[in-house]
Amino acid sequence: MSPDRLMIARRYLDDARSLLLAGRLESAVSRAYYAAYQAMWAALGNPPKGEQWRHIGINSHFVRGRWFEPAYPQTGPGLLEHLRFSLHRLYQFRVDADYDLTPINTKSAEECVRTAERTIAEIEQRV
């Protein structure tokens, strides 16, 4: 567990909320994504030596739940399976906003902020 990364994740989440309120929806989505990403990294710790956390891969490792239940099997559904789809959507919205320059609507931006909030809350419950 990395308290510094979790602190950064919370800060990014605050930024996402502020951007959402200001109507800067694409930026809110991007900050929400990185809030969740940094929170997952905080929970998982650093990747194995010589590797790095890939954006889609970190979701799978996080959802598996072995970061808080190390004896949990490596196959079958993860302990945080209820977050998998939302995290994938958050990633896709971020790609849409940052790379494809797709306009994001308020409902989608709110969904992204909620996903980041839920991700951080799941971690805070377990640390």
Where are these predicted regions, by residue range?
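Terminal alpha-helical segments
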Residues: 1-127
